[in-house]
C-alpha cells in the first residue's frame, strides 16, 4: 500500500505460534475486509500477499481458557434495529442471555428494558480511535471502511470466554453478501458476510477446541423483512437509530447513507409521513442528499 496510509505492512504476534492456516486467514481478512478501501483509493491491483504480512515470535505459550462449562448466549447489542430485533427473538431465552455493547448509545438501557433484558447483565466496552488517525485524515491520508464487524466478533469471543457463554450472537442480515461495487465481488461490509462468518468459525475451531460459537441470527432476513418485523414494535422505534454519526444520541443526522436508506424503507413499509415522524427529517426534500440517493440506487459509484 502507499505510504499515505496508517495501515501496517506487517503484524507481529508475540504469544504462541502461528500456523500457516492462521497466517492465511489474517491475510484474507485484511485484504477482503478492506476491499472497498482498495476500490475507492485505486488499489485494486495490489495483491493479497503484498497488502500485509503476519509473523510471530514465540515469547510465551498462553494457556487457553477452560471451555468445559459453557452455556447460554452473549448477544452483540448496538441499540440499532437489527440487534434490537435479535433481542425480541431471544427474549424467551433471557435467563441464559446477556448482551455486550461497544460504545453504546445513551438510551441503550431503555431499549434493553423494552425487550425484557433490563435485569440481565450488560457488558459495556469502551473503544476509542487514536488521535493520530484523525489528524492523519485531516492531512490527506487515505480513508475507508475497515472490517469493524470482525473486531466485534473477536471481542465477542473474548467476552464469551470470560462469561462462560456458549454462543456469540450477532445480527448481520442477507444483504451483506451482495456486492456494492458491481463486477468486483466487493461489499464494504465483508466482515458481516456469510463467507466471513464461515471462515471465522473455521478459524476459531483451528485455535481452540469446544470454545464459544459465533453466528448471525438474522442471516436469512433481508433489510425490508427486518423493517416489516418491527411493525409490532413501533413504540420503541423513536429510540432506535441506525445513524453512525448520531447513534450515540439515538438520533438521525439525515445526511448519511444509513439515514437515507432507513428513511426510504420506513416510507416503503409504513409511509413517508411515518418516516418523517421517526427520523425527524424530510430527507427526500433535501437536495443535498441527491448524490447519496444515486449511490443507493446504484446509478453512481459508491
Provide a role label for each language-model segment.
Residues 1-3:
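Short, well-ordered junction/capping motifs at the entry into regular secondary structure
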Residues 6-73, 84, 89-130, 138-141, ...:
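RNA-binding accessory domains that recognize and position tRNA/RNA substrates
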Residues 10-14, 160-168, 267-277:
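Short helix-capping/linker segments at secondary-structure and domain boundaries
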Residues 35-39, 183-203, 287-302:
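Charged/polar, low-hydrophobicity segments characteristic of intrinsically disordered regions
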Residues 84-89, 150-158, 228, 258-265:
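Contiguous, well-ordered alpha-helical segments that form the cores/surfaces of helical PPI scaffolds
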Residues 103-238:
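ATP-dependent adenylate-handling ligase core
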Residues 206, 210-211, 215-219, 231-302:
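ATP/NTP-dependent adenylation/nucleotidyl-transfer catalytic domains that generate, transfer
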Amino acid at each position: 500500500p502507499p505510504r499515505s496510509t496508517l495501515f501496517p505492512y506487517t503484524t507481529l504476534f508475540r504469544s504462541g505460534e502461528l500456523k500457516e492456516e492462521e497466517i492465511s486467514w489474517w491475510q484474507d481478512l485484511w485484504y477482503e475486509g478492506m476491499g472497498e478501501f482498495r476500490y475507492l483509493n485505486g488499489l485494486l491491483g495490489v495483491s493479497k500477499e503484498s497488502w500485509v504480512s503476519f509473523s510471530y515470535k514465540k515469547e510465551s505459550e498462553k494457556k487457553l481458557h477452560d471451555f468445559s462449562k459453557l452455556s447460554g448466549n452473549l448477544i452483540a447489542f448496538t441499540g440499532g434495529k437489527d440487534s434490537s430485533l435479535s433481542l425480541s427473538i431471544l427474549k424467551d431465552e433471557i435467563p441464559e442471555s446477556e448482551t455486550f455493547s461497544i460504545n453504546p448509545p445513551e438510551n441503550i438501557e431503555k431499549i434493553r428494558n423494552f425487550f425484557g433484558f433490563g435485569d440481565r447483565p450488560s457488558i459495556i466496552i469502551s473503544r476509542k480511535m487514536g488521535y493520530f488517525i484523525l489528524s492523519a485524515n485531516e492531512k490527506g491520508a487515505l480513508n475507508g471502511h475497515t472490517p469493524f464487524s470482525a473486531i466485534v466478533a473477536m471481542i465477542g469471543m473474548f467476552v464469551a470466554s470470560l462469561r462462560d457463554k456458549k454462543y456469540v450472537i450477532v445480527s448481520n442480515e442477507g444483504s451483506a453478501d451482495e456486492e456494492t461495487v458491481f463486477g468486483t465481488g466487493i461489499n464494504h461490509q465483508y466482515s458481516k458476510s456469510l463467507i466471513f462468518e464461515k471462515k471465522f468459525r473455521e478459524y476459531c475451531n483451528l485455535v481452540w477446541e469446544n470454545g464459544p460459537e459465533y453466528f448471525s441470527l438474522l442471516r436469512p432476513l433481508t433489510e425490508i423483512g427486518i423493517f416489516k418485523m418491527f411493525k409490532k414494535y413501533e413504540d420503541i422505534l423513536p429510540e432506535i437509530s441506525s445513524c453512525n454519526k448520531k447513534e450515540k444520541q439515538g438520533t438521525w443526522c439525515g445526511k448519511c447513507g444509513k439515514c437515507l436508506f432507513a428513511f426510504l424503507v420506513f416510507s416503503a413499509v409504513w409511509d413517508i409521513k411515518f418516516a418523517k415522524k421517526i427520523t425527524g427529517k424530510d430527507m427526500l426534500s433535501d437536495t443535498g442528499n441527491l448524490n447519496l440517493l444515486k449511490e443507493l440506487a446504484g446509478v453512481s459509484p459508491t
